[in-house]
Amino acid sequence: MATIRPDDKAIDAAARHYGITLDKTARLEWPALIDGALGSYDVVDQLYADEATPPTTSREHAVPSASENPLSAWYVTTSIPPTSDGVLTGRRVAIKDNVTVAGVPMMNGSRTVEGFTPSRDATVVTRLLAAGATVAGKAVCEDLCFSGSSFTPASGPVRNPWDRQREAGGSSGGSAALVANGDVDFAIGGDQGGSIRIPAAFCGVVGHKPTFGLVPYTGAFPIERTIDHLGPITRTVHDAALMLSVIAGRDGNDPRQADSVEAGDYLSTLDSDVDGLRIGIVREGFGHAVSQPEVDDAVRAAAHSLTEIGCTVEEVNIPWHLHAFHIWNVIATDGGAYQMLDGNGYGMNAEGLYDPELMAHFASRRIQHADALSETVKLVALTGHHGITTLGGASYGKARNLVPLARAAYDTALRQFDVLVMPTLPYVASELPAKDVDRATFITKALGMIANTAPFDVTGHPSLSVPAGLVNGLPVGMMITGRHFDDATVLRVGRAFEKLRGAFPTPAERASNSAPQLSPA
């Protein structure tokens, strides 16, 4: 198997890229030298074809009609049976469409990925099937997952089941909408800047971003290796804990995971007494320029209601919370341009299981369909290219060197408190924008809500969004964040609040005025 050889034009372009001057002699000599070096590429290609290429898998799937997909939340539907019985037997799960399901088409919300069918199941898919779950389909996500709203998918906007003229949130908007609408029992979401917690908050469901590295990212399309997370989106905290118990733990294929990572016990203490736990309300998480006062008030009321069951609730200042967003922004922008775009998703320089078929497919379409990318991805491309080339990646290096300081600021507060609380989002779901909205408004509406969620992607702390109440008839999320690998306490506090609050209504119950009464907010 012969690797494609560069022609003279390609060699000239490579030389210009690196500032290398090619004289007449060099132009004659380099093709043969490069050809010799590419001999190893030929050997690797043949070895991979013989020894490591995954077998082709065929699984039935369907593209649902508009009437079958009123929220535009399904990319394709399936009915993949479990591989064994387990704790999830009889439960239906949707998989975010940046996560590979062998034999089922994948789009990742983007024309640049459209047409790809993976040959491997992601680790989380394998584990869900082994635990008895049925995979009901792939849920629509944002274009390359770089949006906190739900209007950038190439397949069209995902609609909020509470009000179909409003955003469902992103980038896991399809996952949250399907859970909220009762189409599935739970879903897999991904989170690089809040993309599990944002749609969970907008749609009135539970979303948990686990501690970084707790759940293997193997088989999901990356954005930036140091902020990639997968986690559960569910109706209840109990189901989030149950799902986490299935998908957590080291798989040996993900460089994001330390060798010591083990799944915890998230269920045995879930309903334990929370009397005496200390809750810190982070002042810097409130009063953003775009914050709705009613949302801030609802979350403060929800947090203070925990005193009714014995928790101590106090306010705390963490000034680094306001800096952490900017640290995240540099890492996500430069790192996203370097790995997600120039690195065709996976990048290099790390061990782990790669998906070379997906890398090659994306590389073949990334430039061809660049104009079809969302404005948010174009912002990453243009800003990140400047950061990498003109600034030499130094800003990325500075941001990475600041991460330990931001992490330490939260850790200091978490020595005083068991968990930290703030609004997941500064406002309730807004109306979907018009198709001809100007570029600046497009980007602001897509990314303007992530100030509280993004910091914990870069610091890696576990962070849970639970419904705190309703403002103007729309859900509000309260975010509960804890110590690294203490996901159990985060979920325990969320569960205690859930029981105190009472069952959160579904959109259908709210519409029929049969919703249960909520205690706080």
Curated annotation (Swiss-Prot):
Indicate whether Hydrolase appears among the record's keywords.
yes
Q: Which GO terms describe its molecular function?
A: amidase activity
| Keywords, sorted A to Z | Hydrolase
Q: Which SUPFAM superfamilies match?
A: Amidase signature (AS) enzymes
EC top class named in words: hydrolase
Q: Which reaction does it catalyse?
A: a monocarboxylic acid amide + H2O = a monocarboxylate + NH4(+)
Highest taxon of the lineage: Bacteria
Enzyme Commission no: 3.5.1.4
Task: Spell out the residue ranges making up region: Disordered.
Answer: 155-174
Pfam family of the protein (one): Amidase
**Which residues are the active-site ones?**
96 (charge relay system), 171 (charge relay system), 195 (acyl-ester intermediate)
InterPro entries for the chain: Amidase (IPR000120), Amidase_CS (IPR020556), Amidase_dom (IPR023631), AS_sf (IPR036928)
Question: What function does the entry list?
Answer: Hydrolyzes propionamides efficiently, and also at a lower efficiency, acetamide, acrylamide and indoleacetamide. This enzyme seems to be stereospecific and can lead to the production of a single enantiomer.
Tell me, how does this one assemble? Homodimer.
Note the PANTHER family from the entry.
Answer: AMIDASE (PTHR11895:SF170), TRANSAMIDASE (PTHR11895)
Q: Which family does this protein fall into?
A: Belongs to the amidase family.
Q: What is this protein called?
A: Amidase
Q: List the taxonomic lineage.
A: Bacteria, Bacillati, Actinomycetota, Actinomycetes, Mycobacteriales
